[in-house]
């Protein structure tokens, strides 16, 4: 049995949900998967930091109030966000990074990942910024230090589209994909089909926790553009930057557009797509598309996400699932940790 020491960077909904999963299921993982997780450090810009090489109680962390400086309530805790110290010095084997996405330069999350990889620590993250903007550098750094850099949760939260495509569809020669990759925009479009105007639909999404106070990144397609870069670079061997992906959001769609689509047996969807062209180049875009009701993505409603992969051997393969949610995204971090453990186990068996 292996025990992995874990540091949580960012302690909002996702890493808090991961702490709750550890509290509830650690013994189950020991029996079923052959490992347990021990939290040895937590740092958060708002809550502060705490470190203990002997381990922190996961249940107590999960119950911690979401109030400024709350980490100071714990033995050894402080109101200060000691990000670098926690990442470098708490003795963690794995860093679970779940801070906010900065679509401009990927900071500070990119630095958090870089510090960990340079110190020979595995990194699992749900953050789109570091992968979309600095993915090649960070993957090279991970290889150089013989550690893993995993980011399954960066595209569709707990729905394992990256690993499914790379493993289950390996050898099928994926030539492109198109997907509904943002739950907020899809919720807004579904609400508009129910008669709400755009502004009302956005307000409802905010009230339900699907949309941020500033919904621009979601409804204007910027969030999806980062995900298209990640998927295209990972699955199509592209070298795209965000500037290579044309981007148009849904804010210009009116109720008249939605109603006309209904009469024509079609639905508007915000689609992120990339395709390998005959000359080997990659075309990528984010835009509202009018899909006929028999299209595999047309039936995807509310905050659900889906992606349809096109391959030479299988044609179209469509995967749908939750594209948001604290527990679902925390599961993506767990999935990455399981992958790290299984890879390490195979290496050990190979050397025996």
From Swiss-Prot:
Acyltransferase keyword on record: no
EC number: 1.1.1.3
Inducing or repressing factors: Up-regulated upon growth on canavanine.
Keyword Nucleus: no
Gene3D superfamilies: Dihydrodipicolinate Reductase, domain 2 (3.30.360.10), NAD(P)-binding Rossmann-like Domain (3.40.50.720)
InterPro entries registered for this protein in UniProt: HDH_cat, HDH_CS, HDH_short, NAD(P)-bd_dom_sf
UniProt keyword terms in alphabetical order: NAD, Oxidoreductase
Recorded superkingdom: Bacteria
Signal peptide: none
A GO term, aspect molecular function: homoserine dehydrogenase activity
Leading EC class: oxidoreductase
Catalyzed reaction equations: L-homoserine + NAD(+) = L-aspartate 4-semialdehyde + NADH + H(+)
UniProt protein name: NAD(+)-dependent homoserine dehydrogenase
Organism: Pseudomonas canavaninivorans
